[in-house]
């Protein structure tokens, strides 16, 4: 039986408990092929007994002895700390890097008093781990000269902008749910990469 995984996440196999039985959670995860009590047995096959249906007159309950696969979709990408832009020179350097390397950069325009901005920053650092060729920066609008803020044409926060070839290309204004913002940022990067 083929097993299709949408991403490099961890799969583990475990035996389904008998009806009404409590089973403690597994201590560790393992891949389908190795480890755990299900090593070497194919997924979705009966694990007990010989052929057909067990003994005469006995009926197997659904899930009894069945091997089940569970996927754990936690994020395995390592967060990358975003670099701070605190002057016009650093902004120009970041844009120059984008032009020289023909790669987009992401700039998170935020403020220290903005709760949504603070909440999104570690999530953006996780996304930075997913896109190794793209550099991620942040600008605290209260700590930089107004010329930097005007250059980004910032009116709302958090604003996450994608710059490519030294020019503004796209932006996401993060006033809605964090997971939606992160999905929009991923789409924006994939579109302009």
UniProtKB/Swiss-Prot annotation:
Disulfide bond annotation, renumbered to this chain: 114-117
Coiled coil: none
Active site as annotated: 114 (nucleophile), 117 (nucleophile)
GO cellular component: chloroplast stroma
Gene3D superfamilies with a match to the protein in the record: Glutaredoxin
Keywords on record: Disulfide bond, Electron transport, Redox-active center, Transport
Family (UniProt): Belongs to the thioredoxin family.
Protein's UniProt name: Thioredoxin-like 3-1, chloroplastic
Species of origin: Oryza sativa subsp. japonica (Rice)
């Amino acid at each position: 039986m083929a097993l299709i995984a949408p991403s490099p996440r961890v799969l583990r196999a475990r035996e389904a408990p008998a009806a009404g039985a409590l089973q403690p959670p597994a201590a560790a995860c393992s891949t389908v092929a190795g480890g755990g009590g299900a090593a070497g047995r194919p997924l979705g096959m009966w694990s007990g007994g010989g052929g057909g249906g067990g003994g005469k007159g006995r009926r197997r309950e659904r899930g009894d002895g069945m091997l089940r696969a569970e996927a754990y979709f936690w994020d395995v990408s390592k967060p990358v700390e975003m670099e701070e832009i605190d002057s016009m020179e650093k902004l120009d350097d970041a844009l120059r890097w984008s032009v020289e390397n023909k790669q987009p950069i992401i700039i998170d325009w935020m403020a220290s008093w903005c709760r949504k901005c603070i909440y999104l920053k570690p999530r953006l650092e996780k996304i930075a781990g997913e896109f190794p060729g793209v550099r991620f920066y942040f600008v605290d609008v209260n700590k930089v000269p107004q010329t930097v803020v005007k250059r980004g044409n910032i009116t709302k926060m958090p604003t996450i902008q994608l710059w490519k070839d030294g020019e503004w290309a796209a932006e996401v204004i993060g006033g809605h749910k964090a997971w939606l913002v992160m999905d929009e940022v991923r789409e924006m990067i994939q579109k302009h990469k």
